[in-house]
């Protein structure tokens, strides 16, 4: 199964509660001691400065990486050291953009550097299962109106991606309007994309989580 770890303020803002600082890695060590049968393991580390956090990333990798673990480091800040990092780490790449584009780029990197290269044997059905279980990027939360960030969304050549959206329930009609705008926009993506919407209520918060799945049949 997969894990997401972040370093720096920018990744934490992008991924919210999904982001975990790599210093707090006890649960990862415990998880590696009891792997899920039939699944290879990989970790995605996201940082807003590989130069600044290089020692912390190295320390984390030394504490959890063994012969069967694959990992990648994604940097939200390009630097002159990028070639050195590519030579040093198993997989290193530069990502950036807004919240939605960042998630799509992460999935693209997983496909290009881990799945497509044959490092592990996941296909896209397996990747969807992993994402749905929340072991990787389960959701990116957007509160309030959806129109603003929808305008910045551009479909890229990814075969699989997902979103988790959180809406305030202060105005019931506003939620309906947002869902209509969201559904209309997603239906324009790719070749016959499938849109699935699931509503879940939190008992401790007056909010609903909307999980949207879309996928294209061509990469």
Q: What residue ranges belong to the model's regions?
A:
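Tubulin/FtsZ superfamily GTPase core signature
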Residues: 1-219
